[in-house]
Amino acid sequence: MKTIIVFLSLLVLATKFGDAKEGVNQEQKKEVTQNEFRVEYLNEMAAMSLLQQLEAXESALFEKEAGRNSRQXRCAMGDVPCTKGKTNCCKGYECKPKSPSWWYDTDFCQPIHGGRPIGI
């Protein structure tokens, strides 16, 4: 019976002092995790800033490349029907009547300066 009382008293003391240490440990854990989150947050913010800079540089390069490689798409060359209101003729061509003939109902893309257009 005496041994049981000794073990129970040791158990009570261990739990009492164990809880005290556990509280201190939890406070230390909170501080450590807060510091880790701060560091992780700062690292993440730096990474996001770097990512935004890279995306901005990449978009600028793509715009420059697209501007360099751009060309007129689907333009009409010589003797292709066109409409006066829409400019679907290529560079160096203009939409005008083919000849003073009455049977041509539409206009055609024709070179601006007679023969071969300038710039093509």
Swiss-Prot record:
InterPro entries the UniProt entry points to: Toxin_22
Keyword Secreted belongs to the record: yes
GO MF, one annotated term: toxin activity
Gene Ontology CC, one term: extracellular region
Localization per Swiss-Prot or TrEMBL: Secreted
Segment forming the signal sequence: 1-20
Organs and tissues of expression: Expressed by the venom gland.
Disulfide bonds: C75-C90, C82-C95, C89-C109
Record keywords, A-Z: Cleavage on pair of basic residues, Disulfide bond, Ion channel impairing toxin, Knottin, Secreted, Signal, Toxin
Function (record text): Ion channel inhibitor.
Family according to the record: Belongs to the neurotoxin 14 (magi-1) family. 05 (ICK-7) subfamily. ICK-7 sub-subfamily.
Free-text note regarding domains: The presence of a 'disulfide through disulfide knot' structurally defines this protein as a knottin.
Protein name as it appears in the record: U13-barytoxin-Tl1a
